[in-house]
Amino acid sequence: MYLTKEEEKILDGEYGEVLRRCMNLLVSLGDIYGADKLIPISSAQISGVSYKTIKDIGLEFLEDFAKEDVKVKVYATLNPAGMDLDIWRELGIDEKFAKKQLRIIEAFKKMEVEISCTCTPYLTGNLPRFGEHISWAESSAVSFANSVLGAKTNREGGPSALAAAIIGKTPYYGYHLDENRKTTHIIELDGQLISNFKYGESFYGALGYLVGKIVKNGIPYFENLYKLNPNNDNLKSLGAAMAASGGIALYHAKNLTAECRVKEVVNDKIEKISIGVEEIKEAYEKLNTTNEEPDLICIGCPHCSLMEIKKIAELLKNKKLNADLWVCCSLHIKAIADRMGYTKIIEKAGGKVVKDTCMVVSPIEDLGYKRVATNSGKAAVYLPSFCKSEVIFGDIEELLKGR
């Protein structure tokens, strides 16, 4: 792997131990995956923020870095934490958990990482341009950046994204190379599914769950998804579910995604997969693990856009919920929802607009929640293992109706 003289100095420890460790990690990754050099990045998005997921060992790792007074070299934002950083007491979060979570946040702050704590950084200012090289870690954000925006990133781990942010570079391999962005599977929706389409936004989570299971870590091309006229929130949900059930970090969709005009495929014998009503029905059945009533309704995995919050507020006007409701979003989106009056409507109905976190990385199992209703395919995949929760999966209207 070729290194510049400056990069060699960093690797030799001439600029301190933290930079040496960061460079060593990036060079090691480059060696493993056959990168020939490091390339500059324009931004980073760092996972491994919730104390629930990184525990004491992650906290110590971050505080070791922060005490050396090292700063990130590029614009870097954080993934969700394990709690709302302001109203954690109101949510019932244990004080011991909260104190350690706040130490994690303080460590990132010292390194000048933006404390936006969201899995949708592209909605809050971390918006890469077409073809830009970035180093992002959150799986749903990686999918959106690669696919919808046409930026270039591998699915990084938290430490490698942090190292890239501190060095300002990443190894040149994987999805940074055009030859690794070609279609491996063609997905076609059955004509009957399209002509008799009866689903709401949860359809994209179910479809993503199904395609992720089939394609695994390949690159699907959706031949006729555009006929359903999905919006960016739908594409966000689709990519998140595919990344959760498989390992998909990039997809193409005719007339919808950034690189769709050049339909390059791996070879002439590419597999074509047809998905119809029965397959979607089966996906819904698998994602639903209980018929009982939920004790928590969670919407916002990935974090809600303003339009999603507006829809929830409209559905909850003059209503009262029987179950707890968390509407998860970023600090930025919540500020606008507050101004628009959406937060007040949701709170009047008995719900909460929760920022900085989501149902998957917060300790909801310790708060007594056992059955969670969600419209998110990604959350439906992760909740049983991450939170020991049973899942009710469906459209927002269904989840809020009669509850």
UniProtKB/Swiss-Prot annotation:
Q: Name the EC number(s).
A: 4.2.1.182
Which BP terms from GO are recorded? isoprenoid biosynthetic process
GO MF terms, alphabetically ordered: 4 iron, 4 sulfur cluster binding; lyase activity; metal ion binding
| Enzymatic class | lyase
Q: In which pathway does it act?
A: Isoprenoid biosynthesis; isopentenyl diphosphate biosynthesis via mevalonate pathway
* Coiled coil feature spans: none
Reactions catalysed, semicolon-separated, are:
(R)-5-phosphomevalonate = (2E)-3-methyl-5-phosphooxypent-2-enoate + H2O
Name the InterPro entries on file: PMDh-L-like_dom
Cystine residue pairs = none
How, per the record, is the cofactor bound?
Answer: Binds 1 [4Fe-4S] cluster per subunit.
Residue numbers binding (R)-5-phosphomevalonate: G48, V49, S50, N79, P80, E138, S139, K378
Q: Which UniProt keywords apply?
A: 4Fe-4S, Iron, Iron-sulfur, Isoprene biosynthesis, Lyase, Metal-binding
> Where [4Fe-4S] cluster is bound, by residue?
C119, C301, C358
State its cofactor: [4Fe-4S] cluster
Functionally, this protein is described as follows: Component of a hydro-lyase that catalyzes the dehydration of mevalonate 5-phosphate (MVA5P) to form trans-anhydromevalonate 5-phosphate (tAHMP). Involved in the archaeal mevalonate (MVA) pathway, which provides fundamental precursors for isoprenoid biosynthesis, such as isopentenyl diphosphate (IPP) and dimethylallyl diphosphate (DMAPP).
- Subunit structure and binding partners: Heterodimer composed of a large subunit (PMDh-L) and a small subunit (PMDh-S).
PANTHER family in the cross-refs: DUF521 DOMAIN PROTEIN (AFU_ORTHOLOGUE AFUA_6G00490) (PTHR36577:SF3)
Q: Which family does it belong to?
A: Belongs to the AcnX type II large subunit family.
- Output this protein's name: Phosphomevalonate dehydratase large subunit
